[in-house]
Amino acid sequence: MRDSRVSFIAAPMIGRLNHVGVATPSIDEAVKVYRDLLGATKIHDKFALPEQGVWVCFVDTPNSQIELIEPYGDQSPIHGFLAKNPKGGQHHVCFEVDNIVAARDDMRAKGCAILGSGEPRIGAHGTPVIFVHPKDMGGVLVELMERPDGAH
C-alpha cells in the first residue's frame, strides 16, 4: 500500500546531502567546537573564496561534511547573517545534483527564485553551484551543487 504522505516524482533531482553550511564569526573558534566537543578528527585547512566573500573550512563527518564559513572582506554576504545571529549558526544545506543547469532550470520552472545572477558559479568543492531562495524552500537556504568527482 502506498503511503499518501510520501510524494513520488518520475526523476528525483535531489541527491546526497553534501554538507551543512554553518556561518561563524571565527572559523578557528568553530573548529574547536567540532574537534574538542564533538570529536571531529578530519578538519581541512581554511581557505579563501574571495569571489563569494567567504573563508571556508570543511569538517568531515562519517556521512557528510560541515562547511564552516566566515566573512571574507567588507562585502561578504555572511556579514548580514552574523548581524542577525552574532554567534553564527546554520546557514544553508547543500544537496548534490547531476546537472546544475538542468536543476536550475527545473527550479525556475517550478517558480523558485535563484539567488544572484542565476548563473552557476564555482563553489568550495570546485563544482558549479546555485542557491535557491529560502522563501521558496520552507525558510531554508538551499545550495545545489553539481556532483563532484569522487565522494569525500
Model-identified regions with their sequence ranges:
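An N-terminus-focused feature that recognizes amino-terminal "leader" regions
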Residues: L37, P50-G53
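N-terminal beta-strand motif that seeds the catalytic metal site of vicinal oxygen chelate
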Residues: F8-V31, G88-F95, E146-H152
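Extended macromolecule-engaging scaffold surfaces
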Residues: N18, A40-H44, L141
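Vicinal oxygen chelate
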Residues: F8, P12, T24-V31, L37, F47, C57-V59, G73-S76, F81-D136, ...
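Short connector loops at helix/strand junctions that flank enzyme active sites
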Residues: V54, T61-N63, N85-Q90
